[in-house]
Amino acid sequence: MKDRKKDRKREYRVFTIADWEREQDYLRKRHGEGWKFTGLTYPGVYHFVRCQPEDVVYQLDYNEEGIKHKDEYVRMFQDCGWEYIQDYAGYSYFRKPV
């Protein structure tokens, strides 16, 4: 039986609102190391699953209007090749292969 704990991990990180670009870089680096971001929970716990290392860019987007019109907002990103992951602290998290 496969050890599922080895295929999942959590990391604690703190990024401020001003650090959104550093956060994107952190998620991209982890994906390149074979850890795909699956979600963020309070307080700053990042969840990952093992994956094939791949160059994937992450986008954190803060848009109050997007939150008000969620379906159209997410569809706009999906039409441009982005995968929606989640919302957290006002930001929407997206990713796509480079």
Question: What is the meaning of each model-derived region?
Answer:
Residues 1-98:
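Terminus-proximal functional modules
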